[in-house]
From Swiss-Prot:
<dbReference type="GO" id="GO:0008361">
    <property type="term" value="P:regulation of cell size"/>
</dbReference>
<feature type="site" description="Arginine finger; crucial for GTP hydrolysis by stabilizing the transition state">
    <location>
        <position position="1278"/>
    </location>
</feature>
<dbReference type="InterPro" id="IPR002713">
    <property type="entry name" value="FF_domain"/>
</dbReference>
<dbReference type="InterPro" id="IPR039007">
    <property type="entry name" value="pG1"/>
</dbReference>
<feature type="domain" description="Rho-GAP">
    <location>
        <begin position="1243"/>
        <end position="1430"/>
    </location>
</feature>
<dbReference type="GO" id="GO:0005829">
    <property type="term" value="C:cytosol"/>
</dbReference>
<keyword id="KW-0342">GTP-binding</keyword>
<feature type="domain" description="FF 1">
    <location>
        <begin position="270"/>
        <end position="327"/>
    </location>
</feature>
<dbReference type="InterPro" id="IPR008936">
    <property type="entry name" value="Rho_GTPase_activation_prot"/>
</dbReference>
<keyword id="KW-0343">GTPase activation</keyword>
<keyword id="KW-1003">Cell membrane</keyword>
<feature type="region of interest" description="Disordered">
    <location>
        <begin position="1166"/>
        <end position="1203"/>
    </location>
</feature>
<feature type="binding site">
    <location>
        <begin position="95"/>
        <end position="97"/>
    </location>
    <ligand>
        <name>GTP</name>
    </ligand>
</feature>
<keyword id="KW-0547">Nucleotide-binding</keyword>
<dbReference type="GO" id="GO:0005525">
    <property type="term" value="F:GTP binding"/>
</dbReference>
<keyword id="KW-0446">Lipid-binding</keyword>
<dbReference type="GO" id="GO:0005096">
    <property type="term" value="F:GTPase activator activity"/>
</dbReference>
Amino acid sequence: MMMARKQDVRVPTYSISVVGLSGTEKEKGQCGVGKSCLCNRFVRPSADDFHLDHTSVLSTSDFGGRVVNNDHFLYWGESGQMPEDCVDFKVHVVEQTEFIDDQTFQPHRSTALQPYIKRAASCKLASAEKLMYFCTDQLGLEQDFEQKQMPEGKLLIDGFLLCIDVSRGMNRNFDDQLKFVSNLYTQMAKTKKPMVMVLTKCDEGVERYIRDAHSFALNKKNLQVVETSARSNVNVDLAFTTLVQLIDKSRGKSKIIPYFEALKQQSQLIAAAKDKYEWLVSRVVKSHNETWINVNRRMQSSIEYQDYVHLEGTDKAKKLFHQHVQRLKQEHIERRRKNYLSALPRALESLVPELDEIDRLSWVKVSNLLESKAEFLKVFIVLEETPWEFTNHIDSIDERIPYDLLETVSAAEVYASYLEKLRNARKKEEMKRSFKDNLITSPFITPGKPWEEARSFIMSEEFYQWLEEPVYMEIYSRHQKEIIDKAKEEFQELLLEYSELFYELELDAKPSKEKMGVIQDVLGEEQRFKALQKLQAERDALILKHIHFVYHPTKDTCPSNPSCVDTKIEHILCSRCTYPYDRLQKDPNVDRINLVILGRDGLARELANEIRALCTNDDKYVIDGKMYELSLRPIEGNVRLPVNSFQTSTFQPHGCLCLYNSKESLSYVVESIEKSRESSLGRKENHLINLPLTLILVNRRGDTSSETAHSLIQHGQQVASKLQCVFLDAASTGLGYGRNINEKQISLILRGLLESKRNLNLVGSTPSIKDLTDCELRIVMCLMCADLFNIEDVLNALKPHTYRPSQCGLGGSVLLDLPIGSQKRRLELMMLSYHSSFNVRKTRLVHGYMIFYAAKRRASLAMLRAFLCEVQDIVPVQIVALTEGPLTFLENVAREQLQEGEEIAQDIEGKFLILPQGQTQPKFDVFYPFFKDVLEKKVIIEASHMYDNTAEACSTTEEVFSSPRAGSPLCNSHLPDSEEDPEPSPQHLLFREEPNISVPTKFTRELEETENLHFIPMINPLESKFNNKVPPPLKPKPPIPYEISKPELSYLDTGSRDGHRKSLTSINWPPLEAFDPSDYAEPMDSVVKPRNQEENIYSVPHDSTQGKIITIRNTNKPQSNGSGNGSDSDMDTNSLERARKASIVTKPVLYRTKCAKLGKFSSYRSSLSVGSDDELGPIQRKEVETGTQGTKGDNTTNSYEADVEDPRKRNILRSLRRTTKKVKPKPRPSLTKATWESNYFGYPLSSVVTSERPIPVFIEKCVEYIEATGMTTEGIYRVSGNKSEMDSLQRQFDQDHNLDLVEKDFTVNTVAGALKSFFSELPDPLVPYNMQTELVEAYKINDLEQKLQAMKELLKKFPKENHEIFKYVISHLNRVSQHHHVNLMTSENLSICFWPTLMRPDFTTMDALTATRTYQTIIELFIHQCPFFFYQRLPVDLPTPSSPSTPPLTQPSPPQSPPLTPVSPSLSLLPAEHNIL
């Protein structure tokens, strides 16, 4: 409706006349009442179009111009409005005024000569071509403004705005103005036109004037008053709109808003517009270098800009822009200033870093000092104009600091802070040094003492003032590391000083509790032992590590590694000797790989042909860019036959590929491996025990999806797991038809064999007397690792110009041509460390020893004593004491050790020499007496060595089951890491076909009868000991029964054993003249003949101290020859006695028997047997019966005497004959122990659990039964149950998973043992191997809270099945430990019983041996803190020392008794009642 009216009806137009006080200055004062400003603001409201100055004093020309047009009124134009009633209208505005002549200051004469009051009330205005008025500047320049004429030159006035100025006008009286307005109102009232009174200049209004104006309006009828301010644009439109509404009665009336309320609304509108404009400016203007012209052009189209300019004008908008730019500039300057000030400390640090240089200087002097520094211009810049913030430098990319900045207060404050920092740093360093000194001097700070215990002894208020707690802890941690490392070094030195004790105890890889207790007792009073009392685990680890070094001495296990003497000597000799690497190049074993291929039905030959096809023409194979000679030995028949033997005199295997394509061929592989390993037990070199195996499934068709193939794969994996070998499914790799294996797999296998070959040191053989063809004498020079002497000085005395590398010796061997006696002789000098010399002492022929020791080091002399204890007195010894200077300057310790060394030399009738270091070296002639003595005893030494080797080679080799360290714990070490015993003679490679062996084994029968294969580990002593499953012994030949327990096989697990060393002290030497070949009985299996033809002749030593031998003959068989050798008459005791009395050559003894200073710990050798209860299994602890020993015929006697051509040497050899005690052959356990096949036990966890039932049924039943009936059983899990009952329980459960344990009436210990057996038989331990290392690292964290949290996080990484079962078992053990007052099973005791079962570490590595203590404490921690780890509870409070519960977590299980923590997991589980699981 409204829109239609807008379209149909013309917009109404009204003419309004604005009137008010006008006239000369006398009448109106110096300024008008604001009529022009009111009209200007209404017609042109924009701030830029509003002008405050509108003069009424005009020149005649201006008055006559077209704008004024000789009239006393101005036409302001028209303005369109949209009032509240939404009806548009137009208003023509006319201002009635009175122009004054600028010459006469009188009103201009116009066409209307009426006075202003009459003229202003006129309703008809006419002025032809009169132009619209803008401002005063328009007059005379009309062409520069818009020219718009008054419509039709005439207007009819519709209403009047009566203006009253309520400001304090100059030279104007308000009352006079009010009288004038009153008259004017009276005149206008006559016109009957609407009228509104407008109060102008209210922004400067006077309250009285406003009040009077309102009073005036009240006296008039219907005279409305509007308060306005044209300058502030307040109520201007309201005044005109109100008048229009009076003119047009149809329009609604607007509310008259008081001035101050309207001003508030206008101010809010302006403020909002200003905020928006400022936001626009901040968004557009980002740089202080912006100009208004550019910015104004970019903002023209923005509504925010337009609104603000309309309200406030461009000038104010520009002003705000400049304010913003100035603010940006200041911010930029402040940023630069801040950067300069932040860089100033660094500048000071680079130019004046020392406090002493500036400590007492003022800032001004320091500023001058900086200018004199050479690096000044790199940091500062001197500007030509200052200050820098008013120069262009503020926009420069130069980062240097303006030099005039240093004159500011801020720079002085920075300097003061820098100076204070230096002073504080100096003070903190002083406090740190003081704190460190306090730690060093404090007697309360011992290795391993926690910070919480130490702080009360060392802290003071001054320390707390200057240093923070983390700083103390860091210093304390570093100090602890230093003193711990020092204590460990000193403790290691202590262990070396007690070398005699370790060698006398004959320790092996798993020492007994008894022997460990001896070590504790002997070392317990030493201060260096007590220093590690808070680090018992580390101390135990050091002892175990040292035992490992004694048991397996190499360069890697040497405590001085990498500064081992062997390494140093090799480097020195390589640089001195000519062609040092030639002999390595000539060694045929260095680049040779011997590979056995085992497989029946042609599999071995086919694979050998395939591999040869991949080789070059000369059987060379390239691996990683290096050429290797590949020697293949395919075997398809009975491995007991010599033709199918794994090892021959010329072929020593480095690995074996086992091929199968059926159950029968797999059975053949297993049976062959078993036979080979059994036969190797009797060999001095039992490398076949640890021969690397690879089991390969051959399937030419590549079919792996069939049921048969899947079954073969599963069986192969089980066999590989039990044999601890690699399983390779060659068919699954996508081979082509007709091929068994690809080149990539061959390379992978050969790389593994090379690594095993290096680790097992299977290259090189022990030289015998025949190795001495290029030299006449072999001398061993023994040097102590870590002795403070220069090896170069020692070697300088050996005529280095004569060095030549030995062709058959070791890395430290050289040849010397020396004049000894009447001619020049060739001598091989082996320069070795003591630990390498121990092996040489037994395994190689040595004519003499040159033993060096440092006079000031006790450990050096102790090692010398330990070494000499086992040397025969027929071997000459040269003792050389190394000193650091003249004797007069030596310390007391060095003097004492020099004296002791000289006394030892006198007692053993050896040579003694003092060799000062760093001085002129003595000539080689000083060793001439020693070499002469060696030459004189050469014959007797070689004869003795020949007899030792022959006797050992002919003895029953099953002695391997006794302690491998009978004579010396170093006999099985590798020297240096590469030496082995000689290749066995051909007679060792002959096997006899026994009826009981040729018959298929039980395992073979089971393999043929069933599809499922289940094997027990063959050489895993740890697992077998935990399960306590000892197989029934096989009956060997001869018929005297012997048994061997599975734990004894641990001696065969390590690859470091090269044979059993016999103690020289246990050998009885018969007199020379009483010698008869028949007096010596040796096994007939050492003779080269088939075993099925040998005689069952054995001899048993009887009263060996008297040299008597009783011969036992086999009466069922005739002698192999017709001689009378070996008859009873030949063994007449009286003849032996007479022969002893007539003896010329006495038997050799050990030096320990000739010198009281040697063997001071020998009492432990007799009091502690090697096969003590802790070291042997329960079966071997039985009394070992003496085996029989048969005599040999003349043919056997001559077999080893015929090689000795020298009659003199032969006679001496006869004189050195001695009885050899034979240990009875012991059967090796069969691979097939199990008598029943389980479909539950021994399977992976994933196959016995489900998502609905994550705990195996068997575990649930056992735990429920134990918790219901056995929580108070004393020693539960420690006391083992009956083995047969445990097997019965497992067998019955296999048949019925719903077995009721209560109904069957099993004992608690039986159920507990079966529970542990379940975990022991798992293919992988419950705690995965890959998590065990991470758990050990987490346990090493010192902070308890962090340790627990780290271990808790690691639990989340467990496989789901393992985690759930581990949680279940640990929770059960935690509940068991809560009854420890009754069952005596604390969390510590439970952890000792369970950690080997749950973790099953590999005890063939030193890391596992030394980590056993940590493993146990980890399981103990899990049990003790079970609520925290699994049930989101807080950690359990640490128990007090007196509490019977678990010990503190920081050291969960410190030993409470003198013996150290045992290493072997099986030993740690031995109960008090009996030593079985």
